[in-house]
Curated annotation (Swiss-Prot):
Keywords: Cell membrane, Membrane, Transmembrane, Transmembrane helix, Transport
The name this protein goes by in its record: Probable starch degradation products transport system permease protein AmyC
Domain called ABC transmembrane type-1: residue spans: 69-259
Keyword Transport listed: yes
Cellular compartments per GO CC: plasma membrane
Organism: Thermoanaerobacterium thermosulfurigenes (Clostridium thermosulfurogenes)
Amino acid sequence: MRKVHVQKYLLTFLGIVLSLLWISPFYIILVNSFKTKLELFTNTLSLPKSLMLDNYKTAAANLNLSEAFSNTLIITVFSILIIAIFSSMTAYALQRVKRKSSVIIYMIFTVAMLIPFQSVMIPLVAEFGKFHFLTRSGLVFMYLGFGSSLGVFLYYGALKGIPTSLDEAALIDGCSRFRIYWNIILPLLNPTTITLAVLDIMWIWNDYLLPSLVINKVGSRTLPLMIFYFFSQYTKQWNLGMAGLTIAILPVVIFYFLAQRKLVTAIIAGAVKQ
């Protein structure tokens, strides 16, 4: 009995330590976003003596917040919509059509997840540049290419839990394959869609590397690209940078907490097979 209590206390202590380690970056960012530059360098971990709300005003002005926010939002929303639709349609075709080629194509999508982006980024950007496609539309197309592998993998697994008898009954009633997918199968895949959306929002919204390679126009830059300019080679405005990071992180945090309950439901639903 005593051994069980010791294990329980150790697990609780370990959980607290891991939670503090996970929260500490957010604490440092939030606390230092309200400090002056001198106060930040004096003691990074201390609470601010006074709340410097001007940091947020200056950061928003320097970021050109409305433009950068709208660019990031447009790219993220369109990328997720296209990834979800393309991945679910592809997975539906591969899972329902029983051919050897379907298995091979599915394996190609699965193996593609193992290819590191860094190994293809230079030739990819070079090819897109030849077609003058280094734009926001080109960036969305790239996100589709890199995000569809995970999407197909998740949807394919979810479709295994949906009986083919639904498809057969709909075909007998005169439904086309597209109507079966759109009106019957896709709504049943909502848990997987929510899971994929949460993962992709956290990836695309916070992505710096790919937009830095693709987007050249100042008016098309995303929030991560604009925040980078607070940490240039010769000037590092850490307090303004922390305020900018807080502004950029806040929408994702709000979305995650709003979608958390549905995400847990999605994970549970995805674990239950017919």
